[in-house]
Each structure stands twice: as structure tokens, then as C-alpha cells.
Amino acid sequence: MHASGYFDVTLAPQAADNPQVRTAQIDRLSIDKKYHGDVQGTSTGQMQAIKDDRNTGAYVALEKVVGSLQGRSGTFMLMHYGYMSEDVVGRWLVEIVPESGTGELTGLSGTMKIIPKDGKHYYEIEYALSER
């Protein structure tokens, strides 16, 4: 199945909590999102990112979505992984953590594509709901 829409996101820097992270210059940010479209709801999470002065770097993130997907209510988790080289995206993968769905989203699996355009973040989700 296919779902699409956009989200508003706020990223807030968090304090580095150990010397190794400060030495490596790994940024830690909180994530707060509001989803519009086929996903209606909010999410919270955390991102870790690293980059150099050429804008080459990578990020990982985890978030929990609370709301509905095409009218089905529940929660699910997302796992992000991405990297870029000198501002060119090399890979950007967002997966629904399999079996993380609750409520009417139990059995949810799939992937999300994020498309930044004109100052907004659009999403496209390809997903399946297994019958349990």
C-alpha cells in the first residue's frame, strides 16, 4: 500500500553527554514532528549526526509516531540511516521497524522516502499490514 503527505519538523541540539562524543564532534538532536496527509499525528525521537567542513557526513535516528495511517490508529517506530558526500545524498533510508505497530497498525512493515522540496519535507510510504 502507498501513503503520502508532508511533515513539519523541529530539531533541537542536545548536550553531548560524554567526552568521546565531544571529541568526535557527533551532534545529538531531539526530533519533534507533526505529520499531515495520509499520516495524521506526531512523533518524537533522537538523531545523531556527524559532518566535516565539506558537508560530508552521516546520520542515524529513531522516532516513534503516534497517530493514524490512512485512518488506522496506533503507533509505530521509524529507523533512519543516511549519508552524504559534499552535499550530495549518497543514501537515505527510513524503515518502519517491523512488528513495532500497535493498535490498528499491528503487523505494520515498510519503508519511507523523505523528499525535501521548497522548504518542506514530503514523505512517501510503501507499507504492508500483516493479518495477525
Language model segments and positions:
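Targeting-peptide/extracellular-domain and disordered-appendage signature
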Residues: 1-132
